[in-house]
């Protein structure tokens, strides 16, 4: 899934998490994985904001994950660990080696969604929905 619309241009983390949360709700995932930072910022706010908007549990700065009986067992960057059950947003501390995509993912078309497709309030998207400038 790819969100692509001029309405999303100039978004800060608040507007970004708003648009992403609407798209994620369409998928009904058990877990949402986020990085610690983006290429254009280092605030670390999108993952936690998504958790709030989605009403999911949140674990941040995760270094490792393992399957557990009732969800996932995580270890964070301080060496603390615990279990987290679905639904949850998990922010990962370090980049991982990318695995080669499966053949199915190579040929599956990417669904492109606009602000209208996710029923977004345009006043909350992009530069219009960004209190930081």
Predicted regions and their residues:
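N-terminal glycine-rich FAD/FM-binding segment characteristic of electron-transfer flavoproteins
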Residues: 1-133
């Amino acid at each position: 899934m790819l969100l692509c619309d001029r309405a999303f241009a100039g978004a800060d983390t608040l507007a970004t998490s708003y648009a992403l949360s609407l798209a994620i709700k369409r998928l009904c995932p058990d877990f949402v994985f986020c990085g610690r930072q983006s290429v254009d910022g280092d605030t670390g706010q999108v993952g936690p904001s998504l958790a709030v908007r989605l009403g999911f549990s949140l674990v941040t700065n995760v270094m490792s994950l393992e399957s557990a009986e009732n969800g996932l067992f995580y270890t964070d960057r301080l060496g603390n660990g615990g279990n987290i059950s679905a639904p949850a947003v998990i922010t990962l501390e370090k980049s991982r080696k990318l695995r080669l995509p499966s053949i199915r993912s190579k040929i599956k078309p990417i669904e492109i969604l606009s602000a209208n497709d996710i029923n977004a309030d345009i006043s909350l998207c992009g530069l219009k929905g960004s209190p930081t400038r």
